[in-house]
UniProtKB/Swiss-Prot annotation:
Entries under InterPro entries matching the protein: Glyco_hydro_5, Glycoside_hydrolase_SF, MAN-like
Annotated signal peptide: 1-21
Gene: manA
Binding-site positions, substrate: W92, N205, Y281, W344
Protein name listed in UniProt: Probable mannan endo-1,4-beta-mannosidase A
Amino acid sequence: MKLSNALLTLASLALANVSTALPKASPAPSTSSSAASTSFASTSGLQFTIDGETGYFAGTNSYWIGFLTDNADVDLVMGHLKSSGLKILRVWGFNDVTSQPSSGTVWYQLHQDGKSTINTGADGLQRLDYVVSSAEQHDIKLIINFVNYWTDYGGMSAYVSAYGGSGETDFYTSDTMQSAYQTYIKTVVERYSNSSAVFAWELANEPRCPSCDTSVLYNWIEKTSKFIKGLDADRMVCIGDEGFGLNIDSDGSYPYQFSEGLNFTMNLGIDTIDFGTLHLYPDSWGTSDDWGNGWITAHGAACKAAGKPCLLEEYGVTSNHCSVEGSWQKTALSTTGVGADLFWQYGDDLSTGKSPDDGNTIYYGTSDYQCLVTDHVAAIGSA
């Protein structure tokens, strides 16, 4: 999801109300073999297996949870997810900046003057440490990604700004930028390499390469996923793309086209990619709400053909949440090849007030939450 300026402002205001005295940092989750789970999340045919249970799973997204500075807020969210029956939480494992932030501001990596500096301090990756630790305690599984295509929280453009280039697309082919990117990946993966909380490592949030030949992203995906598997062969790896570029059941509309440099079927065929991802935003793509059901089934068919499950990783609308998104959930649950769905995005009442709302947010305890979470989890249980 590309965040609006208004949403970023809301997030900034929420974090600005928090004391700059950060809580005492928790140590990074143990990476010793004794701390490792007996089994990591995996695929099983066209389904996922979590903690020994194979089936369909529901989850959500929270880009902001790793930037919170109050541990109690993190625990509140994790507790609500667990009690709701949600199993997977996708979080942003990046927070890139191009200048030194003010004291008390959370940031993960600084790109400046041709070099990158990773922040492992109390206002850096130690905040993500607590998210991982809390997820372990609450039996929540995390998808952690490493960079954003969009400029929100730095993105690929932060690398381009520091190392030179004409745009985000240079990120994929620059040896210098890829070296810095892989250094960051290595730091994060090794930090949580045996945590029971990690569901999958994700290359990026919504990677695109407009007007590029599809080989550009294919080569980057293949190289990066193999690099990650070399660091952690036991974990699943996914792309984090929107599912663009698909011939199966195509109606010729923009998302099915290859103009963003993506070929869903070809990329899914890479042996170091464990499952496919797709996002769903008809309002942004110039399609109808009903169109979304066909988008889901088309990807299910592609994943079935590949022998790998699909994850409906993001989906949202700004109105009529229950009727529109509820229909998509039913389609996903009944479609062979789709193994889980994560709505965008989760909302809660934090110590500083409500978490950020981009119009898609589904807040805990609301009527929308009842239909899209409580009822959906019940439907999964009875399927």
